[in-house]
Every structure is written in structure tokens, then in C-alpha cells.
């Protein structure tokens, strides 16, 4: 037996959403600048909803990504990073992977639409997803403005360990090109030097990392950048992630005291 009658659920939901909005408006200065999101649970959502084809979950999840980014923009968040395809995901069934890459390509093109006026960057190795999808993603991203009020990173073909290795290699390659000695190469490997060569170079580290579907781990997502990030987990599968869930994450973040390891 349901405690709350169905006819009352929608009004109560709207009232709760309004209260969350009002509370956040009072703590505007405490909002995160950069939110990173692990969009987990698309396949589990599809199966729990009775769909044999998990690609339906991916499509519903893709629609939620575009919606969530609008929430970020409306809330005044400056930067959002969404984890769309990890290097581990590339080991999935070929047919499932092909469908997933096609859906990701479609949603990135939607995110990059001129009407949004968002600046979009890919983070990861597009060479891992095939020539045609990579071409479409590069074309979409390059069409977005460099200067905008809202920036989006789409992590595709991304692995946190791989990013750190790539950053160190890029750092050493630059030093070698400048004629560095072996001793100078060793001295060049610093926290600042690695940070400057990450995929997210020039951007602030994430203040808040959100993961859906009940999993409480980073799974290689922004390993270097999230050293002092606040974490927020929810049991909701990604396609079922609601605006009130997003607002609750912001509310909980605004109530925390960040010590940055001190």
C-alpha cells in the first residue's frame, strides 16, 4: 500500500523542488564551480524496466545527459564533465559497443548545438572509438565557441591512469625537444608539470563528483583531478536521475566544509 496517494505525488515533488531551489539561492556562493558526473546504471535501468535491448537504456541516459547539463547551466555551474565512455567500456560486446558509440556521438552533437552557446571539449583518446565517430565528435566540438558562460567536458575513450601516463609522456617529450638532460628530465616531473599536460589542462579540478546507480567508487574517473573533490552518491540509475536529486547533491555540497587534505 502506498503511503502517499498518486494524485499528491506530483504537487509534493514540486513543493520539495521549490524548497531546494530556495535553499540553494540563499547559499549561491557555496555552489561548486566544476561538477563531474559518472552516468552509471543505464543497462541496469533498462533491464529493471523490462527491456531486453540495453541500448534503450543508453538512449534514455543520453537524453538525461542533455537535461542535466541544462540544470547545471541554469544553476550557474561554470563547468561540467560527464563520463560517457571509459577505456574499459571498449571491451563490451561489439554490437552493444557500436550502438553505445553511435548514441554518444548523437548526444555530443546535441550538446554542441549552436543554440546552447556552450564551449565543449573532449577528454580521452578518440582514436579508440573508430574513424567516423571520432571525425563527427571532433567536428561537433570544434564548432563550439571557446569563450562561453558554461563549459562541458565529454569523457570519451577515457581512462584515468592512461591520462596520467599521457601527461607524463607529453611533459617529457616537451623537455626532450628543448634539449633537456637526464637530470633536468627528472626535475621536470612535478605536480604542476603533470597538471599542465592533463586532458583538462587549464581548467579547475572538480569540486563535486556525482555517481549514480549505488556504486561508490571512481572507476578511474579524473583520478588526478579529484584528489580533493567532494563525492555524492545516489541509488538512482542514471536514466531515473531527477532534478531534485541534482538539487540535493548541490545542497549537500554547500553544507560541507572542504579541508583539501589539511
UniProtKB/Swiss-Prot annotation:
<dbReference type="GO" id="GO:0000287">
    <property type="term" value="F:magnesium ion binding"/>
</dbReference>
<comment type="subunit">
    <text>Homodimer.</text>
</comment>
<feature type="binding site">
    <location>
        <position position="40"/>
    </location>
    <ligand>
        <name>Mg(2+)</name>
    </ligand>
</feature>
<feature type="binding site">
    <location>
        <position position="211"/>
    </location>
    <ligand>
        <name>substrate</name>
    </ligand>
</feature>
<feature type="binding site">
    <location>
        <position position="230"/>
    </location>
    <ligand>
        <name>Mg(2+)</name>
    </ligand>
</feature>
<feature type="active site">
    <location>
        <position position="40"/>
    </location>
</feature>
<comment type="function">
    <text>Catalyzes the condensation of only one isopentenyl pyrophosphate (IPP) unit in the cis configuration to E-geranyl diphosphate (E-GPP) generating the 15 carbon product (2Z,6E)-farnesyl diphosphate (Z-FPP or EZ-FPP). Z-FPP is the precursor of decaprenyl diphosphate, which has a central role in the biosynthesis of the mycobacterial cell wall.</text>
</comment>
<protein>
    <recommendedName>
        <fullName>(2Z,6E)-farnesyl diphosphate synthase</fullName>
        <ecNumber>2.5.1.68</ecNumber>
    </recommendedName>
</protein>
<keyword id="KW-0472">Membrane</keyword>
<keyword id="KW-0963">Cytoplasm</keyword>
<feature type="binding site">
    <location>
        <position position="45"/>
    </location>
    <ligand>
        <name>substrate</name>
    </ligand>
</feature>
<dbReference type="InterPro" id="IPR018520">
    <property type="entry name" value="UPP_synth-like_CS"/>
</dbReference>
<keyword id="KW-1003">Cell membrane</keyword>
<dbReference type="GO" id="GO:0005829">
    <property type="term" value="C:cytosol"/>
</dbReference>
<keyword id="KW-0808">Transferase</keyword>
<feature type="binding site">
    <location>
        <position position="92"/>
    </location>
    <ligand>
        <name>substrate</name>
    </ligand>
</feature>
<feature type="site" description="Important for determining product length">
    <location>
        <position position="84"/>
    </location>
</feature>
<dbReference type="GO" id="GO:0016094">
    <property type="term" value="P:polyprenol biosynthetic process"/>
</dbReference>
<dbReference type="Pfam" id="PF01255">
    <property type="entry name" value="Prenyltransf"/>
</dbReference>
<feature type="binding site">
    <location>
        <begin position="41"/>
        <end position="44"/>
    </location>
    <ligand>
        <name>substrate</name>
    </ligand>
</feature>
<comment type="similarity">
    <text>Belongs to the UPP synthase family. Z-FPP synthase subfamily.</text>
</comment>
<keyword id="KW-0479">Metal-binding</keyword>
<dbReference type="GO" id="GO:0005886">
    <property type="term" value="C:plasma membrane"/>
</dbReference>
<dbReference type="InterPro" id="IPR036424">
    <property type="entry name" value="UPP_synth-like_sf"/>
</dbReference>
<dbReference type="InterPro" id="IPR001441">
    <property type="entry name" value="UPP_synth-like"/>
</dbReference>
<feature type="binding site">
    <location>
        <begin position="217"/>
        <end position="219"/>
    </location>
    <ligand>
        <name>substrate</name>
    </ligand>
</feature>
<dbReference type="GO" id="GO:0033850">
    <property type="term" value="F:Z-farnesyl diphosphate synthase activity"/>
</dbReference>
<dbReference type="GO" id="GO:0030145">
    <property type="term" value="F:manganese ion binding"/>
</dbReference>
<feature type="binding site">
    <location>
        <begin position="86"/>
        <end position="88"/>
    </location>
    <ligand>
        <name>substrate</name>
    </ligand>
</feature>
<keyword id="KW-0460">Magnesium</keyword>
<dbReference type="GO" id="GO:0004659">
    <property type="term" value="F:prenyltransferase activity"/>
</dbReference>
<feature type="active site" description="Proton acceptor">
    <location>
        <position position="89"/>
    </location>
</feature>
